[in-house]
């Protein structure tokens, strides 16, 4: 089956969407143990840690997408997945962005295939008429924490260098909806919902 889609994609005029690879639960369970170690480091309470349900590798960010664009985008993502064979990936190491603004886990394995899938997901958005950010070389990263202000991420990155997770086979591409916090409660995180998934390498 080439597409795994729920019956309803939207409930209002637009959705905040991105394409992603979603690691399976046994893989994120390994990472959760590593994050527990990271959160015991000095200063960890000053970071905003992302919840395990939100862990993903973003391939392309589309922003707000109008309802009438979603079918075309979905068809193009299905084609992108179909043209990409399944590949092996593992969570491995990590780094930071923005001089202490974000901490992330990296990837090992067939990163070239992941980069190719990201390029195809980005192209799908452009061909569907979405306004995309300026193209940059893809950096595989899974965001673990963000700093409310620039902090010294050195100890966290150093500890992450020791992390090497088990590999898994990436078999599908997901279209994910980001539901931003609305309650105003401090620390509330976005909720992520896969609204479409397409099997890699499928012929149908």
Predicted regions and their residues:
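Histidine-dependent nucleotide/RNA phosphoesterase domain, centered on the 2H-phosphoesterase fold
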Residues: 3-204
């Amino acid at each position: 089956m080439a597409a795994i889609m729920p019956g309803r994609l939207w409930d209002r005029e637009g959705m905040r969407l991105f394409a992603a690879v979603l690691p399976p639960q046994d893989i994120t369970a390994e990472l959760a143990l590593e994050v527990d170690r990271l959160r015991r480091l000095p200063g960890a309470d000053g970071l905003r840690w992302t919840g395990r349900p939100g862990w993903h590798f973003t391939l392309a960010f589309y922003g707000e997408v109008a309802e009438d664009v979603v079918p075309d985008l979905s068809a193009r993502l299905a084609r992108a997945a179909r043209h990409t064979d399944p590949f092996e990936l593992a969570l491995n190491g990590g780094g930071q962005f923005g001089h202490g603004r974000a901490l992330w886990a990296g990837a090992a394995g067939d990163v070239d295939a992941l980069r190719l899938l990201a390029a195809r997901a980005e192209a799908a958005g452009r061909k569907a008429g979405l306004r995309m950010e300026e193209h940059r070389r893809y950096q595989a990263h899974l965001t673990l924490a963000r700093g409310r202000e620039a902090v010294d991420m050195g100890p966290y990155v150093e500890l992450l260098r020791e992390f090497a997770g088990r590999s898994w086979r990436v078999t599908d591409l997901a279209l994910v909806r980001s539901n931003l916090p609305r309650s105003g409660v401090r620390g509330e995180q976005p909720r992520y919902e896969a609204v479409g998934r397409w099997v890699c390498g499928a012929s149908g």
